[in-house]
């Protein structure tokens, strides 16, 4: 039952990654098309544009959601591959614990960075 639930979250995280990377690709790589319909705002990789996006709450939420989904998806996938090596139960538990702790620590650090970017005072390039 536990593995089925984890697998469900693994698939759900893949869907979240797919949607959020679609938004990223649209924002970063389809600027000309978006500008032609009035959504784009110039060159998306200029430092002023990057900083402007990082100051917006919606982008912070998007970054944190993508971070969480990518960390879970990647670390659960890594854990699943390692558990297929037919290791001892103790080692399997240790691998699961290391992946979980690494995921939580990386999520906390990444979320902290995203929040600090929103709270940064505006910098003029």
Task: Identify the residue ranges that each predicted region occupies.
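Membrane-embedded alpha-helical bundles that constitute the cytochrome b-like, heme-associated redox core
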Residues: 1-125
